[in-house]
Amino acid sequence: MAFANSILDALKDTLVVTAFGGAEQIPYLTVYAVLPMSLLFVSLFTKLSQRWGREKLFYAAIGTFISFFVLFTIVLYPMRSVLHPVDLSVQLLKWLPSGLRGGIAVFTNWTYSLFYVFSELWGDVVLSLLFWGLANETTSLHDAAIIYPLLGIGANVAQASSGFMMKWVTGSGNFISWDAKLRFLMTVVLTCGGCATLIHAYICDK
């Protein structure tokens, strides 16, 4: 999960910063998209956890993320030139104050904006709520002193490993298109999500 989170962090920033509007979008995304969605997700998570239970909620939550990332990789990203209303945004920039440029860019690059939000929520929901919720439930107080530091070390190793892999993929030369690199990286993310689901099912069945 930490391995996938590091990849998503790098991809979301790359897509947003290099798109129409550039880095001006990030404050708008953080305040007006990520924060409200985080609060909504946590509220929904709290309510559903009382009705569904942790195991069912885990599959529902991670299934939502995997479904969106599949949709983005197969449909939204390849069709971005059609889906992004760049011409309309150029006109809006002429009519609206220049201070709203970042907000207009968020609207223009709405597929990237969704990807940014889901990538941020992956760390907040999948790592913070789902993973640590499972760890707290399956780890005894006696074992926690040994296992929790190992989990922290594992997360750091995963982040470092993902950095090396990202460097290898992005530096693989001009003969591989950026679209192909993104598909490869998203395939890795989806594989991590699938493996996490299988491991979770194995732990719950024991």
Regions found by a protein language model. Name each.
Residues 1-38, 120, 126, 130-133, ...:
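Helix-loop boundary and gating motifs at the non-cytosolic
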Residues 23, 50-56, 63, 74-113, ...:
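Intracellular loop-helix junctions on the cytosolic face of multi-pass helical membrane proteins
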Residues 19, 51, 134-138:
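Helix-to-coil boundary motifs at intracellular loop junctions of multi-pass secondary transporters
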Residues 29, 112-116:
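Short alpha-helical transmembrane interface motifs in multi-pass membrane proteins
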Residues 39-44, 160, 164:
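Residue-level hotspots within transmembrane alpha-helices of multi-pass secondary transporters
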Residues 33-34, 151-155:
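Structural signature of transmembrane alpha-helices in multi-pass secondary transporters
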Residues 125-151:
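Cytoplasmic helix-loop-helix junction between adjacent transmembrane helices
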